[in-house]
Amino acid sequence: MRRTLKAAILGATGLVGIEYVRMLADHPYIKPTYLAGKGSVGKPYGEIVRWQTVGNVPKEVANQEVKPTDPKLMDDVDIIFSPLPQGAAGPVEEQFAKLGFNVISNSPDHRFDMDVPMIIPEVNPHTVTLIDEQRKRRDWKGFIVTTPLCTAQGAAIPLTPIYQNFKMSGVMITTMQSLSGAGYPGIASLDIVDNALPLGDGYDAKTVKEITRILSEVKRNVQEPGVNEITLDATTHRIATIHGHYEVAYVTFKEDTDVRKVMESMESFKGEPQDLKLPTAPEKPIIVTTQDARPQVFFDRWAGNPPGMSVVVGRLKQVNPRTIRFVSLIHNTVRGAAGGGVLTAELLVEKGYIDKR
């Protein structure tokens, strides 16, 4: 039986933080023992958190005292999960890594550091070896590993089996992203009610950059950010759903490609987490539906087992002999954030990168 690992969750009262708490409360060997928060230090977690997810605050953590983000108080912590906001996260994560802590970050601050892995466990698990380079280059015993933008994961996971099996030449993506992607309290109601809000060229470019990096690592053993064989573009929007990012992708190929073969490649797709039977790995990373009006955010965002860990793909269509269309749905705060972070931690444990400090 695997020994228990102690986890700290930074920003434990935020929208992603509460998903970490929920998913780790009954995890077989990673336990949330240190809940860090700003403005609520010293108070019981269950009393101060706005529990904006399924179920109730787990009894295992309800009476835990919220603590400051102070490495001196975390001596016995094995893993740090960091869903801190952009800008604030980077210096804090570096401080912890320098002190020997193992940091899994959902923040963008280190996603494009050349020695920092940006991991989707089913897609590019081999990039964990960058940790060795990171430790050597930065002369620290800890590490920082990042998870990609939730939107990038919603596209990259279904694109991976296509990229592995067919000669892609281009992808055009349009997204409709839920409110929780903007954090709490989020967007002003008068900006989003009765509206679809374009996220702008900066967010579009960030999405493309991350998908490009992820796919560039599918076929290569060395990380080459920005290098790929396909042309990518994304147009991103915020809509008034709470959880779940909806994405429409048009994929073009260098030769005639049958949509039925593409569907089969998605249905059969599995990765290392499934082979290793990691606790948070869904049996199917991609669930393909042939129902005409699916996926739908309301019905499908919690797909998979554990719930919310599968990407649902539907509405596959042969547009012309060299173009197919599909729609994907990802639970942005589960698979796209906390669940992806927990699965990454499990992979790192299995690979020997996380053990007693």
Swiss-Prot record:
GO MF, any single term: NAD binding
Record EC number: 1.2.1.75
Pfam families cross-referenced by the UniProt entry: Semialdhyde_dh (PF01118), Semialdhyde_dhC (PF02774)
Catalytic residues of the enzyme: C150 (acyl-thioester intermediate), H245 (proton acceptor)
Thermal profile of function: Optimum temperature is 85 degrees Celsius.
Membrane-spanning segments: none
Keyword Oxidoreductase attributed: yes
InterPro entries: ASADH-related, Asp_semi-ald_DH_pep-lack, NAD(P)-bd_dom_sf, Semialdehyde_DH_NAD-bd, Semialdhyde_DH_dimer_dom
Keyword Membrane attributed: no
Job description of the protein: Catalyzes the reduction of malonyl-CoA to malonate semialdehyde, a key step in the 3-hydroxypropanoate and the 3-hydroxypropanoate/4-hydroxybutyrate cycles.
Subunit architecture: Homotetramer.
Protein name per the record: Malonyl CoA reductase (NADP)
